[in-house]
Amino acid sequence: MMSVIPAQWQPYWQLARLDKPIGTLLLLWPTLWALWLASAGVPSFSLLLIFTAGVFVMRSAGCVINDYADRKFDGYVKRTASRPLPAGRLTAVRALLFFLLLVLIAFVLVWQLNQFTIYLSVGGLLLAAIYPFMKRVTSLPQVVLGMAFSWAIPMAYGAVVGQLTVTTWLLFLANLVWTIAYDTMYAMVDRDDDLKIGVKSTAILFGQNDRLYIALLQLGTLTLLAIIGWLEQLTVSYYFSLLLAAGLFIYQQWLIRHRQRDACFRAFLNNNWVGMLIFAGIMLAC
């Protein structure tokens, strides 16, 4: 794919992670969960288009501001040393301008929605902007990331029904907990490097109890999603999707059993299938 991108645009492409769609997908699935549940299985095409485009744009913006914040650290981490900023292929000023451009595009998209959702979008922007800096001040940056990755859920409910329901916040919490679980796996990949440079994470905080805490978070995710199914009176196909998701969580636990970098990263990537399965269950159950 990179071979067809003009050389001068390749650093921007990589900065926005357009060559690595996993983050976009992990943000997209809960957004689709919310749109389908809020609209009783019949979301409007215009809302689908706006929110899907918004996911792509804001995920890219989040990656850009993350790399800007980490530009002085990424060169010391094996996985991130080749990124455009630490590698010197793009300046910090250009990265900031690119971030502002993406935020402007996101603002144009959200401006098509109702006033309540526009107000809610401010919270999402703030979370996306502050998350990268949380790794310096707290051992729980994954909580802030989870909030940022869940913020499209109240926005979806705001756009569809104009209010935030009990299901809205249960779904928000379920996705928050799930995000902490899978991003802890992601942080396990960099744990040794992060310890050397002073970057904090739940992987470091949990230490040798990391697998236990991830398992508890995964159990919490499934429990909250099951409660949502009961509240929304979803059919058995939804619960079957949760059962399959539980199977994937067990597989992820097996992958991370030795805490090897590649295996932890594979476990992280596997969460894409979790999100897709739950979405399929919601689609069939609504």
From Swiss-Prot:
Disulfides per UniProt: none
Enzyme type, top EC level: transferase
Biological source species: Tolumonas auensis (strain DSM 9187 / NBRC 110442 / TA 4)
Protein name in the entry: 4-hydroxybenzoate octaprenyltransferase
Annotated membrane topology: Multi-pass membrane protein
Cited InterPro entries: HB_polyprenyltransferase-like, Prenyltransferase, UbiA_prenyltransferase, UbiA_prenylTrfase_CS, UbiA_sf
Family membership: Belongs to the UbiA prenyltransferase family.
Catalysis: reaction(s): all-trans-octaprenyl diphosphate + 4-hydroxybenzoate = 4-hydroxy-3-(all-trans-octaprenyl)benzoate + diphosphate
Chain segments annotated as transmembrane: 22-42, 45-65, 90-110, 113-133, 142-162, 169-189, 212-232, 236-256, 265-285
Cofactor section: Mg(2+)
HAMAP family given in the database record: UbiA (MF_01635)
Organism ancestry: Bacteria, Pseudomonadati, Pseudomonadota, Gammaproteobacteria, Aeromonadales
Localization terms from the record: Cell inner membrane
Gene Ontology cellular-component annotations: plasma membrane
Chief location of this protein within or outside the cell: membrane
Superkingdom: Bacteria
